[in-house]
Each structure stands twice: as C-alpha cells, then as structure tokens.
C-alpha cells in the first residue's frame, strides 16, 4: 500500500477578501500561515515522513509547503515545482470580488464559472498585465500552453499528465510524496483518482490547509481517503469553501 498526502494551500490574502485569485501570486494571510503550521503539526503527530514534495509556481502553495516541512523537520527533501499544478486560471475574473460578481451576473452564473467542468470565464487579453505571458516565471513555457482562462476540464488536461509522468512514478518507486497545490488543481487530481463524474466534482469542496491522505493500492487505485484533524472543523471549512461566490 502507498500513501499520498495532498494539501491545499492555507488561506491567502485574496481568499480572505473573497477575490478570484487564479494565477495571481498572492501571499498567505496570517490565518493561512497558522493553517500551514497546524497541518505540519498534524502530520508530525501522525508520524509522517516524506521523500519528495511537489508544488506549483505560486507563492501561497510554496509557502504552505515550506512551513509544513519546517514543522516536520524535513525542509531538506527535494521539492519539484511546476506550473501544471497552478490554480485554475480564472481569466478576466481574477482580482474581482466573488460576491460582487454574483450580484452583477447572478449566483448561478458565477457557480458555473467557478465549478462547472467545461465552461471557462471570460478570457484575458494578451495585452493585459495579468496575463501569464507577462510574468517572468513562465518565460520558458511555450506561449501556446499559457492559458488566458480555464475551466476545470482544461486544468485536468495539464494536471493529469504531470501526475502520470512525474508524481505517480515517484510513488511507485516507493517514495513518500506530499503535494501542496490549489483548490482546482487538487480537484482535478481527486476527480481522476476517485473517478468522479463531472456532476460529482461540482460538489467537491477542498478546504485550505487540511491534509488529505490517500491510501493507494499497487496500481495507485484509491483504497480510502480521509482528512487529518477535527471532524467538525473540517466540515465547517468545507462549508466555508462552498459558500464562496454567493450573495451576502
């Protein structure tokens, strides 16, 4: 049996302000730092050790991972960072308030943009400073691969090949793996692992900063999965994620 640990980054400053973030590189909030520390302490308490870690190219995921590894006393392990684990790109919605956007376009429309499988938000023009072609961290990535907007289907199309080619390979070699990423890149991975339908993934709420453990068989099929921590706290965190994008 293999184990895989997934962690959505701790609350970011834009999570706190209820803004669409996507590929915008924002820092963790104070609460997010505390969530990452708690995640590290939970993993330490349960005796977790890791050989290799994976993360995105965004600070909030990197910082969450670094804090967790520091709490574990495992900052020395190899870390691979890739744009393929970045959050889903929210196009022209990036930087907008979710509740205000719901008031303007309607909750149903915003829910479709946020959670539908194959409907992306309005795209960013390449002249927009928010477009990834303007960001030096992506200068070595072919321009045609950099999104102007994404739906979950698009996110899956970049996450799953990386899972197959890189992450799964390390697990099958017997390495203990932790992945620190984002709500939608992790939803993409969970959909694949659990073979969720497009309808079921719409209802999937992954809370910030709470370790999600997968136990996998020899073929990397899930045996079971579970969150570490207090059940009531986990439930409230999931409800908080589900409530984003609603009128308040």
UniProtKB/Swiss-Prot annotation:
Catalytic positions? 9, 87
Alphabetized, the UniProt keywords read:
Gluconeogenesis, Glycolysis, Isomerase
What pathway is it annotated to? Carbohydrate degradation; glycolysis; pyruvate from D-glyceraldehyde 3-phosphate: step 3/5
Could you tell me the superkingdom of the organism this chain comes from?
Bacteria
Q: Which residues cross the membrane?
A: none
| Annotated InterPro entries | His_Pase_superF_clade-1, His_PPase_superfam, PG/BPGM_mutase_AS, Phosphogly_mut1
Per the UniProt record, one Pfam family is His_Phos_1
Query: Cross-referenced PROSITE patterns, in alphabetical order?
Result: PG_MUTASE
What's a single GO MF annotation on this record?
A: phosphoglycerate mutase activity
Q: Does the keyword Isomerase apply?
A: yes
The EC number(s) attached to this protein equal 5.4.2.11
GO BP, one annotated term: glycolytic process
The site feature described as Transition state stabilizer is recorded at: 182
What does the record give as the reaction this protein catalyses?
(2R)-2-phosphoglycerate = (2R)-3-phosphoglycerate
Residues the entry annotates as binding substrate? 8-15, 21-22, 60, 87-90, 98, 114-115, 183-184
Q: What does this protein do?
A: Catalyzes the interconversion of 2-phosphoglycerate and 3-phosphoglycerate.
Q: Which family does it belong to?
A: Belongs to the phosphoglycerate mutase family. BPG-dependent PGAM subfamily.
| Name by which UniProt lists this protein | 2,3-bisphosphoglycerate-dependent phosphoglycerate mutase
